[in-house]
Amino acid sequence: VAPDGPDRIVLRHGQRGIGWGVSAAVGVALADRDRGVSRAVIGLIGDGSAQYSVQALWTAAQHKLPIVYVVMRNNEYSILKSFAVLEETPGVPGLDLPGLGIATLARGWGCHAVDVETTEELEQEFKTALGADTTTVIVVRTQPEKAML
């Protein structure tokens, strides 16, 4: 999916955006609806960041917003771990996120949601979600990496 005009990419720059993406996608989709724009909104979000505003999935599902969330599941708050290193505060508790059932939670809020393990599964689910008239959450397992600050 390539941006093909103005208002196609909405980003939050800087380190003050953790937790912003789930709700921002809802806002963009609602604004599109008000303007008569028909398109899928894509939210690319980390599993840690998603925890800050996961309840926005309920809003998206209730309004039948055409949002495709791709949630990268690395089982940790990578950005917060990087900040801990930067601030020389090692061993901060609570930054590992094992066992999150993001797809299960999303289904509970009323979204279509799947866990994918392969690139092929991701591609198929993403293509299907782009044509859906509801909110889809695709959870992709990724490897933890040090976040860039």
Question: PLM features: residue spans?
Answer:
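Thiamine diphosphate
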Residues: 1-149
